[in-house]
């Protein structure tokens, strides 16, 4: 890991020639590409589907520190992402999940702030050039997105801490409610952040 931390306006060496001829980060990722509500909102509205529809073959549920979360599903003999097309290119590139956009960067949450770091040797392309972090992420209104990520990170941590001290029945209730409010309930095409805030209030109410 590069010890340096970056913000949205910093330049970092991540450009990789548009991943020409390479799909290494779309293969053999196991359960690591965890999806947040923003990712689900993007997938549902751009693919005209539902969470249940995505669960049929593109995503799956797994447990992370006691909390049930969806992730992209690897499949086939090459163990690749289900959204990889016949040309071995991302079929959802314009609305790909946040962790896919991020790579080869990582996120560091500290004292209510979000910074980025470079994962050394994570990308196999050897001649990377510099790009501004916010351009690399390519998400409209980066500050709003970061505020969402911080709130989501804090909620997950809070729930995972709570789960560690709860009975099996309580853990089941937490997970069922969490999944229903933030994932299973259909997202509208309207402003995601407004919908997320409403769901946060409902969950904590």
Predicted regions and their residues:
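Short loop/turn segments that flank or connect secondary-structure elements
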Residues: 1-205
């Amino acid at each position: 890991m590069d010890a340096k931390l970056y913000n949205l306006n910093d330049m970092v060496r991540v450009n990789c020639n548009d991943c020409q001829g390479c799909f290494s980060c779309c293969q053999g990722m196991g359960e690591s590409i965890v999806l947040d509500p923003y990712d689900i909102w993007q997938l549902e509205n751009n693919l005209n589907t539902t969470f249940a529809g995505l669960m049929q073959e593109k995503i799956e549920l797994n447990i992370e520190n006691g909390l049930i979360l969806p992730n992209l599903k690897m499949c086939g003999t090459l163990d690749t992402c289900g959204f990889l097309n016949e040309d071995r290119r991302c079929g959802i590139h314009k609305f790909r999940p946040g962790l896919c956009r991020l790579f080869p960067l990582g996120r560091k949450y500290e004292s209510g702030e979000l910074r980025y770091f470079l994962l050394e040797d994570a990308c196999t392309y050897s001649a990377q050039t510099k790009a501004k972090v916010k351009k690399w992420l390519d998400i409209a209104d980066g500050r709003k997105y970061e505020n969402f990520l911080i709130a989501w990170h804090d909620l997950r941590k809070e729930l995972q801490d709570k789960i560690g001290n709860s009975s099996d029945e309580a853990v089941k209730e937490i997970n069922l409610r969490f999944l229903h409010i933030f994932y299973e309930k259909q997202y509208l095409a309207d402003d995601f952040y407004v919908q997320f805030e409403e769901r946060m209030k409902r969950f904590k109410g």
